[in-house]
Amino acid sequence: MDLINIALDGPAAAGKSTIARQVASKLSMIYVDTGAMYRAITYKYLQNDKPEDFKTLVNQTTLELTYDKSKGQRILLDNQDVTDFLRENDVTQNVSYVASKEPVRTFAVEKQKDLAAKKGIVMDGRDIGTVVLPDAELKVFMIASVEERAERRQKENEQRGIPSTLSQLKKEIEERDHYDMNRDISPLKKADDAVTVDTTGKTIEEVTEEIMTLVNNI
């Protein structure tokens, strides 16, 4: 099969990253977690006491993706590996705001396009099929119920030792959905030629196979 690019979009906790990793592994492709890029910039934003000059912030930022056989994708922010800090609560609560800023978006999208230029990429995010990879050979828009997404996020938090309640997480997810879908720059929306995959009630294996079937039908 010729080298292709696959775009996976969808709201928070729809399972994008998990499925993207599985699909990339099965196809021996490179997985790019674009959300981690925005989280890294958000981490720097928080470490710098929330500056509002985002253009200066990104101009003074270096961001590099590396791949570790045992740990997967790692994010180097200003030459420091910050991957293990990117799922902290304060980062999660601020990433939508930071990612909505035009200088941040431009900075990240340029890097994402460069990574995908040679094909063979599985990339997940919110605007991959619409903005970053509008010519991707396969575009998938993943959805799931708010209830299930909150349960998934709670399990992730438990694994990291982060206390949270389902009601709190449901509220946060609903608020983030609204923010992501209504922001001025690169709002979350399904590309016209994307295939919708509902992951509610499905196992990782079931969703992966569903997308592999789509790949095989290209």
Curated annotation (Swiss-Prot):
Subcellular location: Cytoplasm
Reactions this protein catalyses: CMP + ATP = CDP + ADP; dCMP + ATP = dCDP + ADP
Coiled coil spans: none
Main location class: cytoplasm
Residues at which ATP binds: G10, P11, A12, A13, A14, G15, K16, S17, T18
SUPFAM superfamilies: P-loop containing nucleoside triphosphate hydrolases
Major enzyme class: transferase
EC assignment: 2.7.4.25
One GO MF term attached to the UniProt entry: ATP binding
GO BP terms: nucleobase-containing small molecule interconversion; pyrimidine nucleotide metabolic process
Record keywords: ATP-binding, Cytoplasm, Kinase, Nucleotide-binding, Transferase
Domain of life, per lineage: Bacteria
Protein family per UniProt: Belongs to the cytidylate kinase family. Type 1 subfamily.
NCBIfam families: cmk
The protein's name: Cytidylate kinase
The species this protein was found in: Staphylococcus haemolyticus (strain JCSC1435)
Record gene name: cmk
